[in-house]
Each structure stands twice: as structure tokens, then as C-alpha cells.
From Swiss-Prot:
Enzyme Commission code: 3.4.21.88
NCBIfam families, sorted: lexA (TIGR00498)
Reaction equation(s) it catalyzes: Hydrolysis of Ala-|-Gly bond in repressor LexA
Post-translational changes noted in the entry: Following treatment with mitomycin C protein levels begin to decrease after a 5-min lag and do not return to their original levels for at least 90 minutes.
Organism of this sequence: Bacillus subtilis (strain 168)
Family: Belongs to the peptidase S24 family.
Name this protein carries in UniProt: LexA repressor
Induction: By mitomycin, requires an intact dinR gene. An SOS-independent induction of dinR occurs during competence, does not require an intact dinR gene.
Subunit structure and binding partners: Homodimer.
Catalytic residue positions: S127, K165
Length: 205
């Protein structure tokens, strides 16, 4: 495989993902936002190097004309983290938690905090839609047993049911707040925090 820098891999990976999910490549601005580059000229420089290496082809007269030339180029395994997918958690009415690993899902290492235990859960329901978490999405969760007010968590209720909600510790109770104005919060005396949601993965059908 052609040797690429981590930034070039990130850019190539993002372009491939956008083409696969949307059917067309991202703009230079979108690439910059995705990989943390504020300067469009820096993005252009990386694209030029990818083009020189024969991995992409660009049409300078069009803003989104980026074609992947080598579809076999992929992320080296050393830059992939296999994250366990653990059952399903509701984002509507709680369902009984299933804590078994169903499969492992490869994620780019930049999406996974170093030295942290991370897992993924499939969402069922639409109570978190205003937070950008939709039915059938996968949430990426950093395993931890505490949370700050306002954080989105995976919480285990007193009935050993798991749910994804925004966490608030109030004077006499815990409030698990949905991000959907049509739904009521869950009020409990005690909950166990399984982890904090740090990302969302979505496939476009």
C-alpha cells in the first residue's frame, strides 16, 4: 500500500465514507471540518499529495469532484479499534438490557479515546432525536459509572433496564431526560451509569 500520513488516511477515509453514504464526495470545507483542519489551503495540499500518489483524481473546475481511484486502499489494521457491540438499548421506553457482545465493529482509532473502555449499542426509538440520535443508530459509549448533569448516558434503572437519556441529578431524585418534546422524563431514586455517549454511528439506507 502507498505510505500515507495519518492525516492523509483520515482524509481518504472520510471521502470514501461520504461517497458511500451520500453518493457524492465532500467539499473541501467539509473535509477540513471532519479532520480538524481550519485552512482550506492545507486541505488542498493534502488532496494534491493524494492525487500525486494516484489515490484520487480531482476536477479543479468543480467543488466536489473528487474520485477515489484505488478502492482497495483501506485503513491499516493498526489504526482500527474493534469495538464490542453490546445488545440493544432503547431511546424510547426502556427495554430489558442485554449485556452480551453480539459482534465487534471496527472504528478508526481517532474516534476512540486512548486507554478507555468503549462499547457500542444500537438505539431503538426516537426519544433522543433532538440530540441527533435516531432510531437504529449506534451510539459509541465510553464506559464509566459517573456522569455530569446534561451529559447523555446509558443508564441502568432500578428494574435492570437500560436506556439512553440526558442525565440530571436533582435534589431528591435522578431525572433521565429525553430529547423529544413529546416524551416525558423518567424520574428515579437510583440509577446505575453504564457509560457516557461520546459519538453516534449511522448507516444511510
Amino acid at each position: 500500500m502507498t505510505k500515507l500520513s495519518k492525516r492523509q488516511l483520515d482524509i481518504l477515509r472520510f471521502i470514501k465514507a461520504e461517497v458511500k453514504s451520500k453518493g457524492y464526495p465532500p467539499s473541501v470545507r467539509e473535509i477540513g471540518e471532519a479532520v480538524g483542519l481550519a485552512s482550506s489551503s492545507t486541505v488542498h495540499g493534502h488532496l494534491a499529495r493524494l492525487e500525486t500518489k494516484g489515490l484520487i483524481r480531482r476536477d479543479p473546475t468543480k467543488p466536489r469532484a473528487i474520485e477515489i481511484l484505488d478502492e482497495e486502499v483501506d485503513i491499516p489494521q493498526s489504526q482500527v479499534v474493534n469495538v464490542p457491540v453490546i445488545g440493544k438499548v432503547t431511546a424510547g421506553s426502556p427495554i430489558t438490557a442485554v449485556e452480551n457482545i453480539e459482534e465487534y465493529f471496527p472504528l478508526p482509532d481517532r474516534m476512540v479515546p486512548p486507554d478507555e473502555h468503549v462499547f457500542m449499542l444500537e438505539i431503538m426509538g426516537d426519544s433522543m432525536i433532538d440530540a441527533g440520535i435516531l432510531d437504529k443508530d449506534y451510539v459509541i459509549v465510553k464506559q464509566q459509572n459517573t456522569a455530569n448533569n446534561g451529559e447523555i448516558v446509558v443508564a441502568m434503572t432500578e428494574d435492570d433496564e437500560a436506556t439512553v437519556k440526558r442525565f440530571y441529578k436533582e435534589d431528591t431524585h435522578i431525572r433521565l431526560q429525553p430529547e423529544n418534546p413529546t416524551m416525558e422524563p423518567i424520574i428515579l431514586q437510583n440509577v446505575s451509569i453504564l457509560g457516557k455517549v461520546i459519538g453516534v454511528f449511522r448507516t444511510v439506507h
